[in-house]
Amino acid sequence: MYKADSKIAEEFIDHQEILDTLEYAHNNKSNRALIEQLIDKAAQFKGLSHREAALLLECDQPDLTERIFRLAQEIKHKFYGNRIVMFAPLYLSNYCVNGCVYCPYHLKNKTIARKKLTQEEIRKEVIALQDMGHKRLALEAGEDPLRNPIEYILESIQTIYSIKHKNGAIPRVNVNIAATTVENYRKLKDAGIGTYILFQETYHKENYESLHPTGPKSKYAYHTEAMDRAMEAGIDDVGLGVLFGLNTYRYDFTGLLMHAEHLEATFGVGPHTISVPRICPADDISTQDFPDAISDDIFCKIVAVIRIAVPYTGMIISTRESAATRRKVLNLGISQISGGSRTSVGGYAIPETPEENSAQFDISDTRTLDEVVNWLLDLGHIPSFCTACYRAGRTGDRFMSLVKSGQIANCCAPNALMTLKEYLEDYAAPDTRAKGIQLIKKELEHIPNPKIKEIAIRNLKEIEEGKRDFRF
């Protein structure tokens, strides 16, 4: 039986509730009056239930679909403006004991090059990332209790935070590692992580078990209940996601929103972020083996409806997607993107040769960070390297209350401009710098609070003179 605030995976992700939701959406996909009513409700910026959102996703009326896209753009702008937070993944190790059939890290893969970074290698990778201009990392590692124990992850986090190269620093380390215990989540909390990220992959229990036949990850309930353990351990910010294409997208879309509702019902705060990766080619993995892979049009609609249903959450897209696809979804809901990414173990300090391939998946957007920043500036977005909320304790329910009230813009807008200015001064190519300076000048005029605007202008001037690390 469906129960949003249950601690049991099969109750807060209830299979029958998802089937009933999909039937409801299918039966009403041409019900203009009902769909218009839901669009009007969503325009109040309070979100939608999983059942209501499933109907918008299923809507087959072209003019109403266009209204859905316009509303998603409006909601994105209201809560996140034209700011796009930049980050990069750092893969520590691809040793893994699981048997996930869609991931080249799986235990039986004998063709992939296995690697694990030493602390000295991590130091070199972080310096390379800092020299690119990155301030925020997403730490990744395969699940291997012997080679990648929690102690290795904790030591790696400490190493990353300790490195200050030239004007560089990594003030926020988000962590994407396998489901673990409350005790280990407390250790991650004490290590000062930002967001704990864990993709569900698919919410369909039977399909999940067939995709994860062996290893610790094969335990559906333990994996699905991981965010509860993380939040019980005191981690304020958690990030959800599914790998679209492993199962029917309608099912996983609904399960994803039910998971968000569960966190809100149980802990009073929903997911800090939602990621929307799609299955893509990798070493010994072909997308042809996954018949549920989705088209660009469906992908864009998924992004738009998630933004409408969960207006407060950050939305992440990686370099799995091409530049063209990333451009489409920026206005529809995405608020964080990676740039200059490597999905190999390391690879920033010294790029891998083809023979050394250790990557988890193939990258579609191969541009450098500066090329991505330049592109965002051309599109009128503000590339943001801000980590202020985490450092000021604006996490969990405190962050969400600011987002839901719209007050977060008083912090985020000037912080984005100041961190962009730092990037322009320290790392940008001349053309990128010129474009960025013009955008900052334009965006300063949109800061409504005169006092904040005055302080921002003063700080920007001091950044030009060599000072760093200003924040509201």
Place the predicted regions along the sequence by residue:
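Radical SAM enzyme core and accessory elements
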Residues: 1-37, 41, 327-335, 341-472
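Short glycine-enriched, charge-decorated loop/helix-capping segments at active-site entrances
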Residues: 211-217, 288-292, 358
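Core AdoMet radical
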Residues: 107-124, 128-231, 237-240, 244-246, ...
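Conserved C-terminal portion of the radical SAM core fold
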Residues: 141, 195, 200, 221-285, ...
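Canonical Radical SAM [4Fe-4S] cluster-binding loop centered on the CxxxCxxC motif
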Residues: 80-121
